[in-house]
Each structure stands twice: as C-alpha cells, then as structure tokens.
C-alpha cells in the first residue's frame, strides 16, 4: 500500500563554477532520504536544480566572451554529470531559465504587485555581487560583506520592494506555533532573535543594473531579483502558475527543504513571507545542516583546500564518498572532511566490517556446502540475539530517518554488522565443519549470516546504492523489499550463492594520501570575486604557544553537551565566520548567561572532536589553582574577529 506523497528539495545551485564536496553533501543527504522514503512505500518527489540568473553570471560570461546562457549550459552539464556519478535519483531538475519557470515567476511578481505587496522606489546601499545582497554600513564586517567576507560596492538604482514587515508578526507566530518548522532548534532561535524580532526591512526584489534575469512583465527595464526568482522554484517545478497543477496539488507543501545553514534566512524568512502573501501553505520543515570544514575552516580557492568530489569518486567510488558524508558528518552541525580520516573509515567500516562479513560468509557457504544455501533446521539460543537485533534494526533506521538523523540510521545498521561478525567468532563455523554430526548446525549458522546480510543489503540500499546491488548479486536474492524485513526468512534454502569480487578492497593509506596531495589545487590569489582572507596562523600545539592567535568572538548560542556534565557547546561569531567550540565551563556558567557575551577565542588550534562534537578553538579563561572559580576573559564589545595582542 502506497503511503502519502513525500516532497524533498535541495537548494538550487548557483552555476558560476563547478560544485564542490559541500554541495555534494546536501544532495547526497537528500538523495538518501528520498530513496529511503521510496523504499518504505512513499510516492516521492525529489527536486534539485540550478539558479541561473544574476549579475555574477553575467560578469563571468562577459569575461569569457560568451553569453550567460552558454556559460550556465556548460556548468549545468557538469552538475548533471556529477549527480549521475554520485547516483543521485532526483525526480526533477529545474533550471530557472526554463520557460515554464520564467512565466510562472512573472505571474507571481505581478500578483504580489497587484495586491499591493510590491511597490516601486529607489535603493542606495552597499552591494555584494556574489551574494546578490545589499547592506548598510553598520552591517559590514571589517568593511566587507557580513555573509561572505568579500568587498562590496556602492550602488543606487530604481527598484521594486516587497513589504516584508507586513507579514513579520504573522511569521513569528507561525514559527512559535510550529516548533518543527525550522530545524535544528538552534537555527530557529537564530532567525527569531537575530532577524525577525529586531524588525524586518522591506526587501529589494528587482534590479536595473544588469539584464541577465527574468524581466518584470509590466516594466521590462527591471529584472526580477533572486529572492522571487530562485525561491519560487519549489512551487513552479510542481506546476504552480501553469495550466497543469496536478503535481502541485499532490506534493505541496514540501515535507522538507534541505539546505545549508548559510541560506537559512532566505528560506525561513523571505520564502515563507512570500508564500503567506500568495495565500499558500508553508513547507512543513526547513532543515539547515552545517558546513563541511576542511583544514579547520570553510573551503576556499584562495586557501587551495576545495575538495573536488569527482576526484574522490574516481579514486574510491561513489559509495565510499556517500558513506563518509552520511555517517561521519553530524547532520545539523559542522563536520570535518579529512582525507586521512576518510580513507581509514573506508578501510575499517566498509572493507573490514561489511566487506569481510560478506566475503567470509560466501566463502564458507562454498567451502562447506558447494555454495548451496541450507535450511535453518538446527537453531540454538545463541541465534536469538542476532535474529532479534536484525528484526529490530529496520524500525530504528526508519525512526532515525524520519527524524533526519542519518548518521544514527547508519550506526544502527553497523551495530548489526558488528554483531554478525561477532556471531561468526561465537559459533566458530570452521570447528563445526570438522564434525559431520554438526553439519546441520553449520548450515543454520551460515543461513543466519546470509539472512543478516540480506537485511543489511536492503537497509543500506538508500545510502550505498551500488554496494547493495553487489551484495544482492552474491547472495543471489531478489527479496529486497522493506516489507520483507518483518520476518527473518527471506533467504531461500536450496538457492546457490554467487562468488564475486571484494566489494571494498583495502586501501594503502599513505599511497592514496600522496596521490590526493598531488591532485590538490594550488591556492588562488584572491580577486574581487574571491574571499578576502583575514588569515589565521598555522595550527599550533601547546609547545608553539608563542604563535597563538587570539580573536574576539561573540557567543550566538550555547547549550550543554549531552552526557558530559562539564562541557558546553557554543556557537560563536568570528567576524563573518561561525564556529562551534566545546568548552569545559559548564560548572561555572549557565548556557543562557553566555549568549550575547564577547569572549576571547584561541582561533588557530587544530579542530578536534570532544564527546563526538567538533570543537574549532578554545575559549580563554582565568582560574585560581584550586579551580574554585573561573572567569572568561572579557575583551569588551570589540568587533568580532579582532585580534587580541
């Protein structure tokens, strides 16, 4: 029986250049969720695409001597190739240059204008071209864009504006009455306290300083700005504003917009207010995941630390990359991408745990029974723990995915894999094989292992798409439905397993690290379009204390670390960059006492994990020798990011 429709979206990506591992992370996560929902009986619409208009695209195309459309066509082809390589199963790929989208956006703009929510005025301010955002002088950080750190330029032009303030109170009420609308919880507090409650300014929604965009139908010297153009894709892709709205009626409102935290404001303030003005339902949830950090910070061409997913897939395969992104990165928090950790994770989890379980089991079925699966006719109490764990794991996985806890879902599956490996050691099939009278027991043990592998194969299929197919081929099974996991009997006695290649060969860590280092892009000198760095010193140890880099930061959020009485998790503003810091100050400060405070951060300590949480620095504090009290160093309300000398 088909369950209710399920609609999941990624952001539509800006095709100014090729996508990196961070973009891939969002799309792989959405794909895993979409595949899981299909597996469990939902009719799914999984949408991704590209946001193809804007001044930056126009400038890049002019520099290349081609049209903007020629430029985006080239980049979009590469994006689609990447998604094919990563086994992304999107149902629709929308481009904002698609005719149906252009017409629908023009209708949306006109409707908002006709009902008085959009008006014409002029705008003067400081403009960031890469972010396509206007800023006031007071909003700048060190004279640069507060979102990306790049230079801004003065701009004045006639423009249309959307009356954001008209709907602000209504949106605040909606967010408060729908606690799951913005997730994780910390993101909701950020939107309410930093943007909505202080008051909203009306939003500029058209431009006249460039032409690469959707013209306003009744005033064609204006092009419709990114907010209405790009955000509307989530409904225009379903047919909103078109004659056939069957998909819109079936799938809207979206179950989840999956986005990076850097575009949360647009999706949780601009977009819902636009929908309110149109009289449409709001999406059920907007989930803002964290960033993928490389070398302790965000990826940047100027640092030469941008990770190319194509290189990784060509070297290690799509499933290895998918597994690391989905298992190792805490969904909702920042996570570390590190080549050495990645390779070691492939060796331990995929080659050792899963790969060895499969190869050992298939080899024993061939060695002792010529590859023929035996009926489980000689059960013993030791079997029950494995069987009961197998039967209970699908429910745990489903609950984790419903809560968007992807790493926890994979952890549950790997708990079963580990238990199966332990079961081999406990039952010692090689000893049973020496006793002819225990042949029936040996057959039962191997059946239990094969059936456990079948469970594993079904459950990993949304995450490791190619691996699941390979396991099924060696098990010689076609029983791959989610429903089949309700009983531990899907493996058919009398069938014959099939010998196959090792699914994850072990990797020589040093050799592959050297290859990756050789392929690493050289740092690019920052230009106007690149991030202006305020460089942090090299990573240090305590022995290098004289090199320590102290920075002023503002505490944005603070909460206890689970199962760690002494630790607090802080999100701090480093001046255009947010960081997560784990600090052992819980016995001295309550979380609510720290929010809004300015403190000093040791900014160039190597990122580490403490109790499973990423810590990107250390808060400076003073304490007497008996630790009877602890005082945080107070720099006063200096600009965030300022160095302490």
From Swiss-Prot:
Sorted UniProt keywords: Aminoacyl-tRNA synthetase, ATP-binding, Cytoplasm, Ligase, Metal-binding, Nucleotide-binding, Protein biosynthesis, RNA-binding, tRNA-binding, Zinc
Cofactor: Zn(2+)
Co-factor remark: Binds 1 zinc ion per subunit.
Residue ranges of domain tRNA-binding in the record: 544-645
Pfam family, one: tRNA_bind
Cellular component GO terms, alphabetical: cytoplasm
Tagged with keyword Zinc: yes
Residues that hold ATP according to the record: 301
The EC number(s) this enzyme carries: 6.1.1.10
Keyword flag ATP-binding: yes
Compartments in which it is found: Cytoplasm
Quaternary structure and interacting proteins, as annotated: Homodimer.
Function: Is required not only for elongation of protein synthesis but also for the initiation of all mRNA translation through initiator tRNA(fMet) aminoacylation.
Record's protein name: Methionine--tRNA ligase
Organism in which the protein naturally occurs: Clostridium perfringens (strain 13 / Type A)
Designated gene of the protein: metG
């Amino acid at each position: 029986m088909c369950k209710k429709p399920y609609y999941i979206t990624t952001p539509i990506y800006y095709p100014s250049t090729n996508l990196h591992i961070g973009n891939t992370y969002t799309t792989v996560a959405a794909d895993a969720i979409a595949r899981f929902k299909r597996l469990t009986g939902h009719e799914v619409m999984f949408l991704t695409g590209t946001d193809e208009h804007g001044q930056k695209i126009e400038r890049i195309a002019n520099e290349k001597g081609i049209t903007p459309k020629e430029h985006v066509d080239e980049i979009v082809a590469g994006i689609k190739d990447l998604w094919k390589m990563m086994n992304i199963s999107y149902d629709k790929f929308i481009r904002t240059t698609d005719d149906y989208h252009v017409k629908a956006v023009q209708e949306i703009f006109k409707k908002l204008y006709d009902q008085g929510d959009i008006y014409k005025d002029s705008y003067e301010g400081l403009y960031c071209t890469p972010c396509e955002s206007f800023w006031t002088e007071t909003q700048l950080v060190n004279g640069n864009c507060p979102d990306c750190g790049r230079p801004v330029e003065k701009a004045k032009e006639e423009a249309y504006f959307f009356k954001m303030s008209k709907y602000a109170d209504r949106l605040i009420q909606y967010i408060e009455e729908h606690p799951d609308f913005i997730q994780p919880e910390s993101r909701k507090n950020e939107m309410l306290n930093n943007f909505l409650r202080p008051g909203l300014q009306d939003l500029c929604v058209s431009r006249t300083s460039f032409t690469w965009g959707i013209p306003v139908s009744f005033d064609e010297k204006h092009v419709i700005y990114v907010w209405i153009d790009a955000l509307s894709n989530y409904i225009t892709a379903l047919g909103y504003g078109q004659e056939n709205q069957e998909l819109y009626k079936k799938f809207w409102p979206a179950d989840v917009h999956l986005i990076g935290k850097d575009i949360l404001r647009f999706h949780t303030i601009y977009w819902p207010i636009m929908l309110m003005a149109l009289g449409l339902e709001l999406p059920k949830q907007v989930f803002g995941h964290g960033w993928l950090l490389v070398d302790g910070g965000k990826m940047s061409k100027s640092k030469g630390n941008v990770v190319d997913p194509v290189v990784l897939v060509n070297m290690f395969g799509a499933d290895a990359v998918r597994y690391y992104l989905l298992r190792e990165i805490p969904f909702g928090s920042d996570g570390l991408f590190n080549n050495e950790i990645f390779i070691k994770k492939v060796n331990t989890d995929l080659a050792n745990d899963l790969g060895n379980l499969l190869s050992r089991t298939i080899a024993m079925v061939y060695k002792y029974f010529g590859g023929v699966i035996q009926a489980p006719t000689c059960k013993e109490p030791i079997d029950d723990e494995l069987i009961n764990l197998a039967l209970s794991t699908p429910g745990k996985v489903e609950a984790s995915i419903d809560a968007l806890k992807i790493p926890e879902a994979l952890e549950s599956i790997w708990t079963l894999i580990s238990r199966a490996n332990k079961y081999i050691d406990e039952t010692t099939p090689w000893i049973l094989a020496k006793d002819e009278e225990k042949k029936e027991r040996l057959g039962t043990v191997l059946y239990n292992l094969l059936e456990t592998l079948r469970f594993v194969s079904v459950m990993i299929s949304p995450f490791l798409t190619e691996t699941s197919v390979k396991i099924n081929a060696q098990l010689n099974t076609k029983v791959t439905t989610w429903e089949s996991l309700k009983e531990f009997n899907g493996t058919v006695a009398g069938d014959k397993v099939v010998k196959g290649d090792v699914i994850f060969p072990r990797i020589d860590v040093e050799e592959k690290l050297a290859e990756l280092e050789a392929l690493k892009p050289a740092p690019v000198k920052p230009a106007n379009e690149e991030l202006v760095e305020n460089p942090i010193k090299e990573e240090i140890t305590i022995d290098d204390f004289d090199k320590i880099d102290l920075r002023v930061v503002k505490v944005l959020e603070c909460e206890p670390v689970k199962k760690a009485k002494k630790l607090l998790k802080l999100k701090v503003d480093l001046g255009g960059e947010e960081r997560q810091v784990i600090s052992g100050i819980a016995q001295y400060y309550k979380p609510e006492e720290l929010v809004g405070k300015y403190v000093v951060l040791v900014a160039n300590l190597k990122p580490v994990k403490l109790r499973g949480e990423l810590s990107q620095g250390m808060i400076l504090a003073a304490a007497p020798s008996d630790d009877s009290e602890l005082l945080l160093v107070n720099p006063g309300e200096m600009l965030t990011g300022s160095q302490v000398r």
